[in-house]
């Protein structure tokens, strides 16, 4: 199974990235959710503007689909500067990064997505650029090689990652601001779905937006994807208006249940409950039971189920929680 093939995958396709640009908030005043991040960034941005300085370098981390790129765009808009965007895998050579840095205007924002995937060679170039606004470049090769320093304008580096633990300490320590994005609460997702529906010209009730939000796994990207599929259903099967009933019908048809679980989530939980009496069950046995690779279970299926309290990892194996039994309307066995 490929994670990107799942309707409830938090990853984005190229088409979705293009479509989402039109409905992204542009300013902090439009930004919904993440109240602590929003209030802190408002102060940091205002302070930098009052001083006439570039904003401190900013690291944004958290699960995929929560709006790290959106926040980077908002920072650039609020600061009134240009945003240059790239990603860790794209910056293969030191010269690739040097070319971007030397083209920055004062106070510009350089956004590096997947910054944990920077090569060590590129990372070494980044250290003096972040700390001293200087670029060290080697000219020539062998014994005749020499280093020259190029002054850079003050700029803000925004790094985004889903794996903050994979960053090296020297890189992580050079960020003056670190923000973690959390999964969104349902009321905030409802607001986001309603806003997206208005941008898309859809007629949608508050209850319809709530139904989509409940099944979006705390993730705006998933919420917007589900909204597009609900729109398709409403236009073909009804008059295009989206109520709670129509949203529920559409999402049930798409095999996304009230908890945001898809077929594979339910298959895993039911395997633990039905085939292994609720567990504990070893990872290899579970992988064989559902016909998936153990890496797929560990990296794709398990994290959300564990976060939401439906599955437990124990030293003896995986166990279904009481909440998982109740989700399927099955009475859990009495604990000894």
Curated annotation (Swiss-Prot):
<feature type="region of interest" description="Large ATPase domain (RuvB-L)">
    <location>
        <begin position="4"/>
        <end position="184"/>
    </location>
</feature>
<feature type="binding site">
    <location>
        <position position="313"/>
    </location>
    <ligand>
        <name>DNA</name>
    </ligand>
</feature>
<dbReference type="GO" id="GO:0006281">
    <property type="term" value="P:DNA repair"/>
</dbReference>
<dbReference type="InterPro" id="IPR008823">
    <property type="entry name" value="RuvB_C"/>
</dbReference>
<feature type="region of interest" description="Small ATPAse domain (RuvB-S)">
    <location>
        <begin position="185"/>
        <end position="255"/>
    </location>
</feature>
<dbReference type="InterPro" id="IPR041445">
    <property type="entry name" value="AAA_lid_4"/>
</dbReference>
<dbReference type="InterPro" id="IPR036388">
    <property type="entry name" value="WH-like_DNA-bd_sf"/>
</dbReference>
<feature type="binding site">
    <location>
        <position position="174"/>
    </location>
    <ligand>
        <name>ATP</name>
    </ligand>
</feature>
<dbReference type="InterPro" id="IPR003593">
    <property type="entry name" value="AAA+_ATPase"/>
</dbReference>
<feature type="binding site">
    <location>
        <position position="70"/>
    </location>
    <ligand>
        <name>ATP</name>
    </ligand>
</feature>
<keyword id="KW-0234">DNA repair</keyword>
<comment type="function">
    <text>The RuvA-RuvB-RuvC complex processes Holliday junction (HJ) DNA during genetic recombination and DNA repair, while the RuvA-RuvB complex plays an important role in the rescue of blocked DNA replication forks via replication fork reversal (RFR). RuvA specifically binds to HJ cruciform DNA, conferring on it an open structure. The RuvB hexamer acts as an ATP-dependent pump, pulling dsDNA into and through the RuvAB complex. RuvB forms 2 homohexamers on either side of HJ DNA bound by 1 or 2 RuvA tetramers; 4 subunits per hexamer contact DNA at a time.</text>
</comment>
<dbReference type="GO" id="GO:0005737">
    <property type="term" value="C:cytoplasm"/>
</dbReference>
<feature type="binding site">
    <location>
        <position position="23"/>
    </location>
    <ligand>
        <name>ATP</name>
    </ligand>
</feature>
<feature type="binding site">
    <location>
        <begin position="131"/>
        <end position="133"/>
    </location>
    <ligand>
        <name>ATP</name>
    </ligand>
</feature>
<protein>
    <recommendedName>
        <fullName>Holliday junction branch migration complex subunit RuvB</fullName>
        <ecNumber>3.6.4.-</ecNumber>
    </recommendedName>
</protein>
<feature type="binding site">
    <location>
        <position position="294"/>
    </location>
    <ligand>
        <name>DNA</name>
    </ligand>
</feature>
<keyword id="KW-0963">Cytoplasm</keyword>
<dbReference type="Pfam" id="PF05496">
    <property type="entry name" value="RuvB_N"/>
</dbReference>
<dbReference type="GO" id="GO:0016887">
    <property type="term" value="F:ATP hydrolysis activity"/>
</dbReference>
<feature type="binding site">
    <location>
        <position position="69"/>
    </location>
    <ligand>
        <name>Mg(2+)</name>
    </ligand>
</feature>
<keyword id="KW-0233">DNA recombination</keyword>
<feature type="binding site">
    <location>
        <position position="184"/>
    </location>
    <ligand>
        <name>ATP</name>
    </ligand>
</feature>
<feature type="binding site">
    <location>
        <position position="221"/>
    </location>
    <ligand>
        <name>ATP</name>
    </ligand>
</feature>
<comment type="similarity">
    <text>Belongs to the RuvB family.</text>
</comment>
<keyword id="KW-0238">DNA-binding</keyword>
<dbReference type="InterPro" id="IPR004605">
    <property type="entry name" value="DNA_helicase_Holl-junc_RuvB"/>
</dbReference>
<dbReference type="InterPro" id="IPR027417">
    <property type="entry name" value="P-loop_NTPase"/>
</dbReference>
<feature type="binding site">
    <location>
        <position position="65"/>
    </location>
    <ligand>
        <name>ATP</name>
    </ligand>
</feature>
<feature type="binding site">
    <location>
        <position position="318"/>
    </location>
    <ligand>
        <name>DNA</name>
    </ligand>
</feature>
<feature type="binding site">
    <location>
        <position position="69"/>
    </location>
    <ligand>
        <name>ATP</name>
    </ligand>
</feature>
<dbReference type="GO" id="GO:0005524">
    <property type="term" value="F:ATP binding"/>
</dbReference>
<keyword id="KW-0067">ATP-binding</keyword>
<dbReference type="InterPro" id="IPR036390">
    <property type="entry name" value="WH_DNA-bd_sf"/>
</dbReference>
<keyword id="KW-0547">Nucleotide-binding</keyword>
<dbReference type="GO" id="GO:0009378">
    <property type="term" value="F:four-way junction helicase activity"/>
</dbReference>
<dbReference type="GO" id="GO:0006310">
    <property type="term" value="P:DNA recombination"/>
</dbReference>
<comment type="subunit">
    <text>Homohexamer. Forms an RuvA(8)-RuvB(12)-Holliday junction (HJ) complex. HJ DNA is sandwiched between 2 RuvA tetramers; dsDNA enters through RuvA and exits via RuvB. An RuvB hexamer assembles on each DNA strand where it exits the tetramer. Each RuvB hexamer is contacted by two RuvA subunits (via domain III) on 2 adjacent RuvB subunits; this complex drives branch migration. In the full resolvosome a probable DNA-RuvA(4)-RuvB(12)-RuvC(2) complex forms which resolves the HJ.</text>
</comment>
<feature type="region of interest" description="Head domain (RuvB-H)">
    <location>
        <begin position="258"/>
        <end position="336"/>
    </location>
</feature>
<dbReference type="GO" id="GO:0000400">
    <property type="term" value="F:four-way junction DNA binding"/>
</dbReference>
<dbReference type="InterPro" id="IPR008824">
    <property type="entry name" value="RuvB-like_N"/>
</dbReference>
<keyword id="KW-0378">Hydrolase</keyword>
